[in-house]
A protein has these predicted regions:
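C-terminal structural segment of proteins
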Residues: 1-180
Length: 180
């Protein structure tokens, strides 16, 4: 899936952490209980939210940030049947098991991603990166707003490049309600 540029492959991307890809460095995500080289090393592009003592890697997907802001649902099928996982619950925080990126069980497969109908009539996506193309976000934000008569009625905001999963800003969402 990851090599075919599918939605499922995009959702399942592994971290871009250089310590994950450098097999000479410790990485709890790659080899549990080996340590996290990024903790004391170069960590400019690592998590500022939701990190743990075991891992400070971030999720690389731009698409996932937008899906989180749009309250998407991941449809999954496996030996135990079908289920739906809220997008904000699909990816895991590292905790004590940073090698587990998501909440799929062994043998489960993503079959669909559903974006529900909503009342959002304004949406924005902004990505800050080191170069103009083919670069991961240093930080990104997806914003979806329902605006009526110049007043924000509902808001949904997610950030990327800042956590092990797309990070919802629920406090900011609530703060924006009623603002002009």
């Amino acid at each position: 899936l990851r090599n075919m540029a599918t939605t499922g492959g995009n959702i399942m991307q592994r971290t871009r952490c250089p310590y994950f890809y450098d097999t000479t460095m410790p990485c709890n995500k790659r080899q549990p209980q080996s340590g996290c080289g990024a903790m004391e090393g170069y960590n400019r592009m690592h998590a500022i939210f939701g990190a743990s003592e075991k891992c400070i890697a971030v999720h690389p997907s731009d698409m996932c940030v937008a899906l989180a802001a749009l309250n998407a649902t991941v449809h999954v099928s496996g030996a135990k049947g079908e289920k739906k996982i809220s997008f904000v619950d699909f990816h895991r925080l590292p905790g004590d098991t940073p090698q587990l990126d998501n909440n799929l069980q062994t043998g489960e497969l993503i079959t669909a991603v559903h974006i529900p109908a909503n009342r959002f009539n304004k949406s924005y996506y902004l990505k800050v990166r080191d170069r103009l193309s083919y670069a991961f976000a240093l930080v990104s934000v997806a914003v979806a707003l329902e605006v009526s008569d110049g007043v924000i009625k509902s808001a949904s905001i997610a950030m990327g490049g800042v956590a092990h999963k797309p990070w919802r800003l629920t406090v900011v969402e609530k703060f924006l309600i009623g603002k002009t």
